[in-house]
Amino acid sequence: MPPSIETYKQAFAATWRDDTPVDQVRFVVLDSETTGFSPVLDRILTIGAVAVVDGEIRLDDSFDELLKVTGDVGPVDVHGVTPDRSDRGYEEGEAVERFLAYLRDGVIVGHHIGHDVSMLDAALERMGTDVRLRNRTLDTADLTWHLAQDGAFAGVKLPHHLTLDTLADLFGVIPHDRHTASGDAFITALVFLRLLKLAARHNRTTLGVICQEFVIP
């Protein structure tokens, strides 16, 4: 097993407890651009992430890597990664190892984060390791719906399908570098900070409470 993956496993000797105050948690806001939506058939093109700690975005604690993809890179007009550019990226296994070394036991935050996690897990499987992402996850869409139930968005009718653009517009976040992994991670981090402030007003101040999944009735 690569040393970086063994180090990643050891990071979970003590995991974040449900009663951990939110301001004590290292959140890692993650986004990836991919060739498509199938973890089996498609591949990760770029991984972008930035940490949020104690209500602040830590630009000095960030990650941005390009991956080499053999074959079809998918919709270039969406993600902007051309085959020539992808050829200059890291091999998948090396990029994932580097990301795990950065991630450690951080709580993963993302918008519809299940896609990114499943793509990374598929990459780990192709590496021949039995390790999968062990980190707690927080989906900004789920947190938004919980806060809506709390009455945080009184007078605002939220669409059934919450996009990142919807939340950015709701909170007045200007979406720079949209559809790049690092750009979308930063936009999501800004949205997440707004959500954390609303959560605090509604007594959602511990990790277990804000990480709850939401099932739309």
Language-model-derived ranges and their functions:
Residues L143-H146, L167, V191:
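Generic recognition of well-ordered alpha-helical segments
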Residues D64, R136-D139, T206-G208:
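Beta-strand segments within the central parallel beta-sheet cores of soluble alpha/beta enzyme folds
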Residues M1-D18, L170, A189-P217:
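Acidic two-metal-ion nuclease catalytic site recognized across multiple nuclease folds
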